[in-house]
Amino acid sequence: LADFCHEQEGLPCWRETSVIHAPYCRISKLLSGYRRPDLTHLQPVGRGRVTSEPLEETGTFTVAGHVFRVLEGAGGHVRGEACYLCDDLALAFPGDIYVNAAGFTQAQSRFNQLAPYLMTSVNMNSPMASAERKAFVALVGRKYHILSGHGAPIWGEE
């Protein structure tokens, strides 16, 4: 939410403050037609992080009677990124903490090949990003249906 607030004020998002990441972010926004969200439709959920664990549960919210847990990452991929887990539906929305690269379309794969040339890594802290992915996989195992930020869904085992 903090990054969206910065954008509303005409300031760069956290990732764009990095000389290494700013060009890639700007190109991504141009190619995707990105528009800032209307903040009247957003609200913070839970509390901020208090531990140094790769993933930390920071709150919950309910949609149609289903409780979703909010797990915030430690900033490996990008600061403030979160996963949303619904245990009773076995649904996981990990954002970019965990992506299905094998399920990328050809266009996504070609675009992602630009990253090494435009910046050294898509992560702000690659060792922490790896720890976040490992924590996510340990948490959901093969039970959850995973709908990540990129790539095709991964359907869990029943």
Could you tell me what each predicted segment is?
Residues 2-157:
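Metallo-beta-lactamase
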